[in-house]
From Swiss-Prot:
Residues 65-76 have a biased composition (Basic residues). GO terms for molecular function: rRNA binding; structural constituent of ribosome. It comes from Phaeodactylum tricornutum (strain CCAP 1055/1). Disulfide bonds: none annotated. This is Large ribosomal subunit protein uL4c. Belongs to the universal ribosomal protein uL4 family. GO terms for biological process: translation. Probably binds the 23S rRNA. Part of the 50S ribosomal subunit. It is found in: Plastid, Chloroplast. Keywords: Chloroplast, Plastid, Ribonucleoprotein, Ribosomal protein, RNA-binding, rRNA-binding.
Amino acid sequence: MTIQKFITYTPLDLNGKQLNFNHELKLNILETSGNYLVHKDLIRHFGSQRQATSSSKTRSEVRGGGRKPWRQKGTGKARAGSNRSPLWKGGGVIFGPKPKKISLKLNKKERQLALQTLIYNKKNNILIIENLETGMTEPKTKAFVKICQDCQINLEQKVLLVVTDKTSVLKLATQNLKNVELLAASSLNTLSILKARQIILTSAAINHIKESYCD
């Protein structure tokens, strides 16, 4: 059973001053703990990151081994049917790795519910900065750090910056900051939200979240 929760945020400008309007976010969350959905989405995410392409050859796939090495009886040696037996050097591998598909299907509504649950749990650590994407004109780390200082954002902690468009200016301005992860709103995922201590959203990004994840 889901219930609706409303969160209201007052956005800041690039100088850290509050603007005279609000953004409201309507979230659907479970009455009971939604941690199991977050866990399922994490398993799905980790599975999609794996290649799982390692492969070894069995005795039937190794080249050679068609001829019986020696006759069955009379030699005093142990019987052998192929020199590509797993017991022999150069033989096949028993129960070796094979390419496999690792995936967990998760319904769209389940994934949306997991993301909304995490956003609600992190509601006190979310900050909205107006026009961050268009306001930064120079690709300088110093300029981005000053904006964070004015908005009282601690760059010693993990910061998730969610934008609609990963512009070259923002990429260059944040790439030298080890604790800042720049993420497009269309790629929002549970792992990035979980790792972040602070989440910065632009106004365009929060509108994208409303349309894509909170319908």
